[in-house]
A protein has these predicted regions:
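An N-terminal hydrophobic leader/cap segment in hydrolases
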Residues: 18-54, 60-67, 353-361
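Conserved alpha/beta-hydrolase
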Residues: 85, 92-118
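Alpha/beta-hydrolase active-site loop
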Residues: 123-143
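Alpha/beta-hydrolase-fold enzymes
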Residues: 158, 162-247
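Conserved loop-alpha-helix segment in the C-terminal half of the alpha/beta-hydrolase fold
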Residues: 281-307
């Protein structure tokens, strides 16, 4: 009965929005700040929005803020399911203060990006390959980072899967932070039956049996057990309450199928990730996640005991070591980049540019 009601809601929504589909599914920027939020969760200073179009995919929204001094590194954040760039504003501001330029790319069909289907709060993507293509286009076409400035991907939950898949697909990065990485389970279950249904294009856009439309009573991240912190735990829900276009409820059958396929692929091709990976969790992960961690060629892990999955939204006790680990990892890449630059200069650049010195052999 619940499934029938959910399907009926989807069909009614599609019928009502048929004449204005582009408006209903289109991208959204310039979000309104929720009045109840503390200033640390506001839009970072100098923040700017942009749109990215990749092939036939729906338009993607991204945002960027930089430091007031010369940037030391570039970080691209890949949010988890249901999050938007607004969820990460506090972290963006803190990373800016460390001297890093920070970009956030809203996922395909999520956040302020355009949607594939209606209703707008139904999570759907045909494949995580669209996330990979978006990341590669953002880096190569929009960011175009200087060769002497490290580029780091920071992916949360299933966003870590998208980040790692981009590296497997050839995106050149200097490091990847996998924050509470989440993979789909391998086991055969009722969910797998829905994944099989998701193979069909028509069925893939239907909601899962447990899907419910977004509502103000939808649990926030603290109520959902993602964080201990009542203020950070309310951030995403507050932004979605104030900005209906950001709302996302549960996933469709097709999204679950895409997640399962990406999870299997990221494990199978883990050996192609050449960049060092920092793996951050609050405790032991699923067997699938642990298998991936062990398969990565250059991966070191840090467990923050007692932390819940949304490490970037945790209370200070757990969030502080998480942030220090992220900032320290990026700083390591900055130091390495500087060391390599100095070696290159000593070997060839300086003598070639100083009159009276012979050219380097």
């Amino acid at each position: 009965m619940g499934m029938a009601r959910a399907i009926l809601a989807v069909l009614i929504s599609m019928a009502l929005c048929g004449c204005s589909r582009e408006v209903a599914t289109g991208p959204f920027a310039e979000s309104r700040t929720p009045p109840e939020l503390a200033s640390r969760f506001f839009t970072p200073e100098g923040w700017a929005w942009g749109y990215l179009k990749v092939g036939a995919q729906p338009v993607r929204r991204y945002g960027v803020a930089s430091t007031w001094r010369v940037p030391r590194a570039t970080i691209v954040i890949v949010p988890g399911y249901g999050e938007s760039a607004e969820t990460w504003f506090e972290t963006v501001g803190e990373l800016n203060a460390e001297g890093f330029t920070v970009w956030v790319l809203d996922r395909a069909g999520q956040g302020g990006s355009a949607r594939y289907t209606l209703p707008r709060d139904l999570g759907f993507t045909p494949s995580f390959d669209d996330d990979v293509a978006g990341l590669k286009a953002l880096v190569k076409v929009v960011i175009r980072p200087p060769r002497d400035r490290p580029l780091i991907l920071l992916g949360h939950a299933d966003g870590a899967v998208a980040a790692l898949r981009a590296a497997e697909a050839g995106l050149q990065v200097d490091g990847i932070v996998a924050s509470s990485p989440k993979l789909a389970p391998r086991i055969v279950s009722a969910d797998m039956a829905m994944d099989l249904a998701g193979r069909l294009p028509v069925l893939g856009r239907l909601p899962a049996t447990d899907w419910r439309p977004w509502s103000r009573s939808t649990p926030d991240d603290r109520a959902a057990g993602q964080t201990h912190d009542p203020w950070r735990g309310a951030v995403t829900h507050a932004w979605q309450t104030a900005n209906p276009d950001l709302r996302l409820s549960g996933p469709s059958l097709g999204w679950r199928r895409a997640f399962a396929a990406a999870s299997a692929a990221v494990r199978a091709e883990a050996g192609r990730v050449r960049a060092p990976v920092l793996w951050l969790t609050g405790g032991p992960g699923s067997q699938e996640a642990e298998d991936l961690r062990h398969a990565l060629p250059a991966c070191r892990s840090l467990v923050i005991p007692g932390a819940r999955p949304a490490l970037h939204l945790e209370a200070a006790t757990w969030r502080r070591p998480w942030f220090e680990a992220v900032a320290g990892f990026v700083a390591e890449k900055v130091d390495r980049s500087r060391a390599v630059k100095i070696v290159h200069q000593v070997a060839g650049d300086y003598p070639a540019r100083i009159p009276g010195f012979p050219a380097a052999p």
